C-alpha cells in the first residue's frame, strides 16, 4: 500500500494522542488478565502532533466510540486514568459547566471524557457505572495529589525566582530567602509523609476515608493519607503482590529521605549565599574570582556561579526528583488494584509514558506478563521484546518502547479489535 493510500485508508485504525500503545497479557493465579497501555506525552496543544490518516481519531473520541460499542460485549472492562480524585470532586460539587469547550492537550481531553462519564454516590462513597457505557468501570489512580499537597505550586514558585535570577544576572536576598522558606515547608511535608508511610499499626483495619473530595491546598489531609498508606502497604489478597508493592514503596521512602538530605544541604548553601551577599554589599571584599582580587561587593562571576548552582539545585531536587518520586504512589496504587482484584480482567490505562514504563517493567519482570502487541518497539518480535524487558532496568526500558522521533500517533491495525 502506498503512502497516499495509508493516508486515505478508511479502515486504518490510527489513533492520535499516545506515543505508543502496548498490549500485555498474563495468567495470574489462574485468571487471564489483559492490559492495554496508552502512553501519553504531556505536550502543550501548540506542540502536539497527530496522525495523517484522514479517518484517524483523537484518542478521547476513539475511547468514547469503542466504550459505547462494548455495550454489546459480555465482558466488563476497567478504564484507569491519570486523574486526581480531588479534580473529579471539583466538577461533582460544581454547577459551573461551560457551554463551549476549548481544545486542550490530549490527556486533558481524555480527562474531560472521564468526567462526563463519571458517576458517583457521595452518600455511599461509591463510584457507579454509566448507562451510556454500561460495561466500562472507571478508576481514578492519581492519589499523589494528597501526598504532594501543593508541593508542585511551591516548586513552580522557586523555579520562577531562580529563572529571574538568571535573566537579571543578580540575586535579591529577599527572594533567595523566599526559596529557603519554601524549601523548609516542602521538607516538613516530606518528613510527615515518610513518618506516615513508615508507621506500621498493629491493627491494619481502618475506617474508610472519602477520597473523592475537594481538598485544602495548605494542610496535609492526614486521615486520607493514612488510609491510602494502609491500603498500599497492608491490604492485599495476594502476598507476592504485597511484597513487590512494598518493595516499590520502600524505594520511594528511601528516595524521599535522600531528597530531604539534599534539601538540607541546599538550605545550608543558600543561607550561606544570602549571608555572603548581604555582608558584602557596598563593602570592600576579597573575591578570588576576579583579577582585581578586592572589589566592592561580590564579582559578577561569583554571583553567576551562585545563580547557576541555585537554579540547578532547584531543578534537580524540587522538580526532577519530586515529580518522579511522587509518581510512584500512582503506580503502586494502580498495580495493586489491577493485580490484587480478581474481578479486573480487561484493563485499559491512559497515563504518562513514564508511568506505563513502570507498569510494563513490574508486570513483565515480576509477574510474568507477556508483550503481545505494540504500535512501536525497537525490537519487532514481541517474545524477544518481553525477554529483553526482563533483563533491563526500569529506566533502560524506555529505549525499547519510546519512538526515536516524537509523534503522537499510534498504529493499532495489528491489535485485536475492541480491547480483546
Swiss-Prot record:
<dbReference type="InterPro" id="IPR043885">
    <property type="entry name" value="DUF5847"/>
</dbReference>
<keyword id="KW-0946">Virion</keyword>
<protein>
    <recommendedName>
        <fullName>Uncharacterized protein R706</fullName>
    </recommendedName>
</protein>
<comment type="similarity">
    <text>Belongs to the mimivirus R160 family.</text>
</comment>
<dbReference type="GO" id="GO:0044423">
    <property type="term" value="C:virion component"/>
</dbReference>
<dbReference type="Pfam" id="PF19165">
    <property type="entry name" value="DUF5847"/>
</dbReference>
